[in-house]
């Protein structure tokens, strides 16, 4: 992706996130169970499976702790694969974006620098306005976290987001560095 195109359309950031998201599915809690030929079999080393499961459990626990509505928490086990892909997809897209812009910095537009616009585009891509009833329904049935948590559940675990927005202890979505999740 050229710096020129990134400067012209924030849509490319969200496209990068979606492509990264789909790539990560090949290595999430379900995709990792299939080998290069698409056959379902365990092909990882036992030590890698153990480390993966340990870290994946931390993601499930993090999302389980999110109170979506009074008396209703997210289901981190149900949404695990999608949450891993959301988090990983943003990181893949961020690295691609930084690589594409390293020799051609982008300008500040509307008071936001290019790095800030990257993360704002990620958030904007999941913007939605749904009813409480739909929130309840999706929380209990959908393998995807609610759109709000696809953003607010992923970004606070990405160091670049902290640096980009100068997020500090005491800020609403702040998570101490040692508690941030990182699967890869």
Regions found by a protein language model. Give the residues of each.
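Single conserved hydrophobic/aromatic residue that forms the stacking wall/gate
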Residues: 1-7
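Zinc-dependent metallohydrolase catalytic domains
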Residues: 8-16, 26-184
């Amino acid at each position: 992706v050229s710096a020129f195109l990134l400067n012209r359309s924030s849509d490319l950031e969200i496209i990068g996130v979606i492509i990264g998201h789909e790539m990560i599915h090949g290595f999430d809690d379900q995709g990792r169970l299939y080998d290069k030929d698409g056959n379902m079999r365990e092909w990882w080393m036992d030590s890698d499976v153990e480390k993966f499961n340990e870290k994946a459990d931390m993601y499930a626990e993090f999302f389980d702790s999110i109170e979506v509505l009074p008396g209703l928490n997210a289901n981190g086990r149900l949404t695990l694969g999608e949450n891993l892909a959301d988090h990983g997809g943003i990181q893949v897209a961020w690295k691609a974006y930084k690589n594409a812009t390293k020799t051609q910095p982008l300008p500040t537009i509307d008071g936001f620098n290019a790095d800030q616009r990257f993360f704002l585009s990620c958030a904007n891509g999941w913007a939605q306005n749904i009813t409480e009833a739909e929130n309840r329904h999706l929380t209990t049935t959908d393998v995807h976290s609610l759109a709000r948590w696809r953003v607010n559940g992923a970004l606070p675990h990405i160091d670049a987001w902290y640096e980009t927005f100068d997020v500090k202890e005491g800020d609403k979505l702040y998570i101490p560095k040692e508690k941030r999740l990182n699967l890869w």
